[in-house]
Regions:
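Short alpha-helical segments enriched in small residues
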Residues: 1-96
């Protein structure tokens, strides 16, 4: 669960929300690596400040916490989703 105030203040697609997601997941999961993703893959949902392709990836491994903002340049939902998966794999690979 994410504190409603975080979503009200920053939005569901935000650094702060992604961080809260991965931190909370690490509290309830027995996994050594936890991952959260929030973003706008399109085709709808974009705003001037949060365009299609804006994605936050959160990864927590032990005490290491990484939140990465990405701006994928495609307007194709499937392409953005594939790019997210590639980016997550790359980050996790570098952490292990």
């Amino acid at each position: 669960k994410i504190n409603k105030n975080i979503i009200k203040k920053y939005g569901a697609v935000s650094h702060e929300c992604c961080k809260a997601m991965v931190r909370n997941l690490s509290k309830i999961s027995k996994s050594k690596i936890n991952i959260s993703i929030t973003g706008i893959a399109g085709p709808g949902g974009a705003t001037k400040n949060k365009p299609v392709g804006l994605v936050y990836i959160g990864i927590k491994k032990g005490k290491t916490l990484l939140i990465k903002e990405n701006r994928f340049k495609s307007n194709n939902r499937n392409s953005i989703q594939k790019s997210i998966v590639r980016e997550v794999i790359k980050i996790v690979f570098n952490l292990i």
